[in-house]
């Protein structure tokens, strides 16, 4: 394996770990606190998360088209800003509407930044030789809950 390929796998693996931890696994740790702070029920927080999943599913094909057209690097890099905007929106939400908008933004980020997009980028980059890279990234991101849950719990205390 070349040094460049190792760097790509490591970088995408870390990015995937953070993306999963800060999106998919986020409500598992923070839904109760979010609900309390926003004056809503925990199921309403999970409704917002469900909205993110629907948005992600609807925009997934578009994310794939963008990766096919422009390559994975610009799409995944730009998507980091969308993730940041969605997370900032959640942090700044003052009520259910703001929270729902933030979850919708996170849904956009999830469409263009989770496994499907990363794997499409690797296939675009390595073609038939992408299998090993995909496996490596999956192994990295498998630690998302291991990293995300304790980190979220710690951040919640701060």
Regions found by a protein language model. Give the residues of each.
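Glycine-rich segments within core transmembrane alpha-helices of 12-TM secondary carriers
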Residues: 129-149
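Juxtamembrane helix-start elements in MFS-like secondary transporters
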Residues: 40-49, 134
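Extracytoplasmic
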Residues: 7-42, 59-63, 148-152
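Short hydrophobic/small-residue motifs within alpha-helical transmembrane segments
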Residues: 50-57, 142-144
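Intracellular juxtamembrane helix-capping segments at the cytosolic ends
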Residues: 34, 112-126
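Conserved MFS/SLC helix-loop-helix module at the cytosolic interface between two early adjacent transmembrane helices
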Residues: 58-97
